[in-house]
From Swiss-Prot:
Top-level EC class: translocase
Record-linked CDD domains: ATP-synt_F1_beta_C, F1-ATPase_beta_CD
Gene3D superfamilies assigned: Bovine Mitochondrial F1-atpase, Atp Synthase Beta Chain, Chain D, domain 3, P-loop containing nucleotide triphosphate hydrolases
Pfam families: ATP-synt_ab, ATP-synt_VA_C
HAMAP family according to UniProt: ATP_synth_beta_bact
UniProt gene name: atpB
Compartments where located: Plastid, Chloroplast thylakoid membrane
Entry EC number(s): 7.1.2.2
One GO-annotated biological process of the protein: proton motive force-driven mitochondrial ATP synthesis
Signal peptide extent: none
Annotated binding of ATP, by residue: G72, G73, A74, G75, V76, G77, K78, T79
Protein name: ATP synthase subunit beta, chloroplastic
Length: 395
């Protein structure tokens, strides 16, 4: 079953509802195995898709109608980031989305469902007004179901793209579990494993799923996919094969998560094909490069700071370190979906506000403010207000 009747409902790989709300009343059904759109139908327009998350919009902006991967090891915040993206996109862009839970924890699937009800993305009183369709094939399902649930989610998204001519963001959490399920099926079929024990058909399987998640001239599919990185090794065949298909990669760093900087996105490791002066604009490009240069220099100085200490640095380097620490903290942001843990209300920061903030930090206009003022705030005005209140507390 596909179409509007799937919105607000949770289905399994066969399209059967698993939310105890009765059958899905849909007259339209699509097969889950469908071919990718022809090359001539693909959309080639380049424009930036604003997420309202500072570090993403600045350092590795997403392409409207592109494919995005969130890479990270265990417990660095992939699911929170993907849930925040669903929340922001549903509110700011107002479209429908499809969320595919591929081999992840049932608890996370349940949490996501409850959060969506709270934030009215799923409307319990009037299900037809919901903004998202959920497709789950969780960890306890057999490998065949986990391997195919991605195709079911793609099929639902394709209906909104091809029939309703809508822009749809499908979210997939987690692509690694799709590969893992494929590896289990491969072993059951008695195939000889290839590198690191993965299936020999890894590239083909990944291609057949990824090639379908694409934008055509009818409507766009901006997909956001979480990719678990086994043992924090980005060269592992699963994340490496995935990144070949993506327009932007958002890499989460354990080091930043340990410092308490959330979202723990590493601007130096994250990449995007959209960060070009002729696409993003000179101003955005120059600001992003300036931020990256400052952070890179700070990274190079870490060894000196760790042993002889800050006093051994030149005056110029000390300034760089101070600004880099402010930038690092300003890249953190309170999330709507994490209000429960952080205790501070979530913030959506527009791209222009983000650029304005970093343009003030880089040349040193805000050198007199303490670095705590930049931690977990929205735009730069909130940082200056926080600095003033910190100052008042001291006095």
């Amino acid at each position: 079953p596909v179409g509007e009747t799937t919105l607000g409902r949770i289905s399994n790989v066969l399209g059967e509802p698993v939310d105890n709300l009765g059958p899905v009343q849909s007259s339209t059904t699509f097969p889950i195995h469908r071919s990718a759109p022809a090359f001539t139908q693909l959309d080639t327009k380049l424009s930036i898709f604003e997420t309202g998350i500072k570090v993403v919009d600045l350092s590795a902006p997403y392409r409207r109608g592109g494919k995005i991967g969130l890479f990270g090891g265990a417990g660095v915040g992939k699911t929170v980031l993907i849930t925040e993206s669903i929340n922001n996109i549903a509110k700011a862009h107002g479209g429908v989305s499809v969320s595919g839970g591929v081999g992840e924890r049932t608890r996370e699937g349940n949490d996501l469902y409850m959060e969506m009800k709270e934030s009215k993305v799923i409307n319990e009183q009037n299900i037809s007004e919901s903004k998202v369709a959920l497709v789950y094939g969780q960890m306890n399902e057999p490998p065949g179901a986990r391997m195919r649930v991605g195709s079911t989610a793609s099929t639902m998204a394709e209906y909104f793209r091809d029939v309703n001519k809508q822009d749809v963001p499908p979210f997939i959490d987690n692509i690694f579990r799709f590969v893992q399920a494929g590896s289990e099926v491969s072993a059951l079929l008695g195939r000889m494993p290839s590198a690191v024990g993965y299936q020999p058909t890894l590239g083909t399987e990944m291609g057949s799923l990824q090639e379908r998640i694409t934008s055509t001239k009818e409507g766009s599919i901006t997909s956001i996919q979480a990719v678990y990185v086994p043992a924090d090794d980005l060269t592992d065949p699963a994340p490496a094969t995935t990144s070949a298909h993506l327009d932007a990669t958002t890499v989460l760093s354990r080091g930043l998560a340990a410092k308490g900087i959330y979202p723990a996105v590493d601007p130096l490791d994250s990449t995007s094909t959209m960060l070009q002066p002729w696409i993003a604009g000179e101003e955005h490009y120059d600001t992003a490069q300036g931020v990256k240069q400052t952070l890179q220099r700070y990274k190079e100085l870490q060894d000196i700071i760790a042993i002889p200490g800050l006093d051994e640095l030149s005056e110029e380097d000390r300034l760089t370190v101070a600004r880099a620490r402010k930038i690092e903290r300003f890249l953190s942001q309170p999330f709507f979906v994490a209000e429960v843990f952080t205790g501070s209300p979530g913030k959506y920061v527009s791209l222009s506000e983000t650029i304005k903030g970093f343009q003030m930090i880089l040349p040193g206009e805000l050198d007199n403010l303490p670095e705590q003022a930049f931690y977990l705030v929205g735009n730069i005005d909130e940082a200056t207000a926080k600095a003033a209140s910190l100052q008042a507390e001291v006095q």
